[in-house]
């Protein structure tokens, strides 16, 4: 199976690798995995007071397509509103990276990780209001 140039670029030069402080109230963390292949993806977002994502980081243990999907979405979501980021679909990720059908689950993981990070952020925000 041949990877596209974009997958190879994001795999060899991943963007935004690392972690944010998950204790911060404006940081949301999404941790997702694919039991079928063993890929695990952690994606974190940092959100400003205006609900714009100011930073995004990821750590992914998996194949080149999983790493490339993570790297790409961290670039895509920076500067977007939380609501706009939530609308990113795995099909858009797969199309951008020219993922073969056997690797579509990697783009789905990235979509799920975004949604999980946003849900975590929103939960923290609600808890902050209650305290």
From Swiss-Prot:
A Pfam family matched in the record: NifU_N
SUPFAM superfamilies xref list: SufE/NifU
Database matches in InterPro entries: ISCU (IPR011339), NIF_FeS_clus_asmbl_NifU_N (IPR002871)
A Gene Ontology biological process term: iron-sulfur cluster assembly
Record-level Gene Ontology MF annotations: iron ion binding; iron-sulfur cluster binding
GO cellular component, one term: cytoplasm
Subunit architecture: Forms a heterotetramer with IscS; each subunit of the IscS dimer contacts an IscU monomer.
Stated role: A scaffold on which IscS assembles Fe-S clusters. Subsequently gives the nascent cluster to other proteins. It is likely that Fe-S cluster coordination is flexible as the role of this complex is to build and then hand off Fe-S clusters.
Entry similarity comment: Belongs to the NifU family.
Name the record gives this protein: Iron-sulfur cluster assembly scaffold protein IscU
């Amino acid at each position: 199976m041949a990877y596209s140039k974009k997958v190879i670029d994001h795999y060899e030069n991943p963007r935004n690798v690392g972690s944010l402080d998950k204790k911060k109230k404006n940081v949301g963390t999404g941790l997702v995995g694919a039991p079928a292949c063993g890929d695990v993806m952690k994606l974190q977002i940092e959100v400003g007071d205006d609900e714009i994502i100011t930073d995004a980081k990821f750590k992914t243990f998996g194949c080149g397509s999983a790493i490339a999907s993570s790297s790409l979405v961290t670039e895509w979501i920076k500067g977007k509103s939380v609501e706009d980021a939530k609308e990113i679909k795995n099909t858009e990720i797969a199309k951008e990276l020219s993922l073969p059908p056997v690797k579509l689950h990697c783009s789905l993981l990235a979509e799920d990780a975004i949604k999980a990070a946003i849900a975590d952020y929103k939960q923290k925000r609600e808890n902050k209001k209650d305290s």
